[in-house]
Amino acid sequence: MAYKSDIEIAREARKLPILEIGAKLGIAADELLPYGHDKAKVSQGFIDSVQDRADGRLILVTAINPTPAGEGKTTTTVGLGDGLNRIGKNAMICIREASLGPNFGMKGGAAGGGYAQIVPMEEMNLHFTGDFHAITSAHSLLSAMIDNHIYWGNEADIDTRRVVWRRVVDMNDRALRQITCSLGGVSNGFPREAGFDITVASEVMAILCLARDLKDLEKRLGDIIVAYRRDKSPVYCRDIKAEGAMTVLLKDAMQPNLVQTLENNPAFVHGGPFANIAHGCNSVIATKTALKVADYVVTEAGFGADLGAEKFMNIKCRKAGIAPSAVVLVATVRAMKMNGGVAKGDLGAENVAAVNKGCANLGRHIENVKSFGVPVVVAINHFVTDTDAEVQAVRDYCANHGVEAVLSRHWELGSEGSEALARKVVELAESGKANFAPIYPDDMSLFEKIETIAKRIYRADEVLADAKIRNQLKEWEEAGYRNLPVCMAKTQYSFTTDPNRRGAPTGHSVPVREVRLSAGAGFIVVVCGEIMTMPGLPRKPAAETIRLNDAGQIEGLF
């Protein structure tokens, strides 16, 4: 049977005017700032007007360790949101915006798939409302002002060997990881080593996604540490006097983007930090606004539960003062087989033994999610190659671990295929069983926080960090940053730092290569193993097959 591509399905969508979608949420037309007919930003005035309302219930969608193609977490988020609306609940979806890097690399878009998509899919996966461009511009403005400050006399006494603010671009470009800038003579400034990260790893992105409002945004931007002096004291963004202009560039980007699903249900798509190199959650302002206008809010956290869900619980919920009522853990038969040792080219063949072996990965994630005090249901995201025996193996494994596994066919059937999952989520959310708590307290030392995540979530025996890293953490504690959470940057494919080590390994070590203080965002980034904050393109990037056809339509964008 031939199935339509995601882009073909999205083009057939019968979209409602965005003003009608806003009306479903009680947003008046003059409180929406339309970008065409099918997307709009929500005004700060409306956001302020709903702050006294009670919150709805928050549902987190996370996943097992993914295959390179992903396991349909966004697709499940969209399908569940549609399913909740189908059974009569007032539900809304909150997801992240797509980065151009993976769109043209190998992962593809971020709007869902099949009949569980958010539209307009093509615009969302490209420039959308320009938020990423605004973030890149604000980040680049600070970069330019730092070197300009040094050029015109260096009043802040910046040690040019200790400029820690890297540049960004929203593209996978390994050639920019390490560069030398200001070459070409005296008129171009003082040459120094520098480098680029991808925009989604920018501290500006994290700040936008964690800020409560424009005032909080400006303060956080001012708190960014951009460099150090010769006496090792920090130089802040506010010392360069850049935070005001950066806030101006980000003014519109701070407003959540309203769009719709294929079934005309409302969705906020706002912010986009990666979960392997950043905190992996959509914006706090979008999530908290959604909780004021919907009874159920379905959101996702990037990659597997060891990364995105851990950061959602320990960083986003802690910072925003929110808590999930239930967690949906997305699993696929093909990921079970890959974690069971099956090669990528053989994932389409039935292999119940490999499924049973790979379920150890699922079991580890179930245990980890439960450790935060939140009830969990496993969603088996159905693929056409799944066999009844393989699906039953996953069901049986989950039953033996005290959770229910629900087969969901939202990719194929839309909300009709996710109705059973939606009913189970409502049952869990309304059971009152949630007793959420982060897994470490604010006042724990920074290194102990790293160890807690490594040992309790990754099941490592030890954290390997040299004296330089340990001393740096102690210096930050003495400077008043002890209470910050830690943001682990590591591979998404494994509980270890080795992307090829599948399943549920124990007894391994977590090597810490680098630590970075994101004082504006309010967390410590811990870079583990070989993870890069500037990805590279694969041997055959998706960009090679993306083109405009003779009718002016985009082809190849999934």
Curated annotation (Swiss-Prot):
EC number: 6.3.4.3
UniProt keyword list: ATP-binding, Ligase, Nucleotide-binding, One-carbon metabolism
Family matches, as PROSITE patterns: FTHFS_1, FTHFS_2
Binding site residues for ATP: T67, P68, A69, G70, E71, G72, K73, T74
GO molecular function: ATP binding; formate-tetrahydrofolate ligase activity
Record protein name field: Formate--tetrahydrofolate ligase
Disulfide partners: none
Pfam families: FTHFS
Pathway the protein acts in: One-carbon metabolism; tetrahydrofolate interconversion
Enzymatic reactions: (6S)-5,6,7,8-tetrahydrofolate + formate + ATP = (6R)-10-formyltetrahydrofolate + ADP + phosphate
GO biological process: tetrahydrofolate interconversion
Family: Belongs to the formate--tetrahydrofolate ligase family.
Gene3D superfamilies: Domain 2, N(10)-formyltetrahydrofolate synthetase, Formyltetrahydrofolate synthetase, domain 3, P-loop containing nucleotide triphosphate hydrolases
Signal peptide per UniProt: none
Organism domain of life: Bacteria
Annotated InterPro entries: Formate_THF_ligase, Formate_THF_ligase_CS, P-loop_NTPase
